[in-house]
Amino acid sequence: MSLNDYVKAQKLGEKRYQAALSKNEYPYLPVLDELITNSDIAGEVNLGLQHISLDRVVGTATKGRTTAFASNFMPILDANSEFGNKWSSLCDSHIEEGIHDPIKVYEYMNKFYVIEGNKRVSVLKYFGADSVPAMVIRKLPKRTDEPENKIYYEFVDFHKQTGINYIWFTQLAGYDKLREYIGCLLYTSPSPR
């Protein structure tokens, strides 16, 4: 069993936990249920199976598991706990055959919050994986005049048209320019003979 890996991951978690406390920051995973309310949401869209960047997986959907992880998704519970044993077993499975089962997440403002699969995310982040398969439910915020909200809705349109979900702009019109560029490439590339 990968108890050694758990202990290493736990040390990374403890380091992040202590660093957050020293800066007066919340030391655990952000909880989507605590960040938004139903009145903040215009609707939900089931996006189905997607590959998502682990860098964009930032928290958990509900408070239930949040104190098992530091804010970097590394475990902080005792290695000899049931949680530690399950994490270690999942680590063994990942080493032997990989993690194939998709996690389930909410996407909100192009960040992902785990509904099911926190330990899978933790193990994959520990091993430095780039992405994870996920069943994604998008929570659409109500439209506002805030620049971040406008950029997000540009992203939603871009994602709907291209399927690309791993590019994030911080200024308005970035997605329009990229869409024009992609369209230009599609229409100017030489046709096969």
Q: For the regions a protein language model found, what residue spans apply to each?
A:
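Short, charged/polar connector segments at secondary-structure boundaries
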Residues: 1-119, 125-126, 171-183
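Charged, low-complexity surface segments at secondary-structure and domain boundaries
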Residues: 72-77, 159-166, 186
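Glycine- and acidic-residue-rich phosphate-binding/metal-coordinating active-site segment common to enzymes
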Residues: 108-111, 115-178
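Conserved small/polar residues in nucleotide/adenosyl-binding loops
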Residues: 187-192
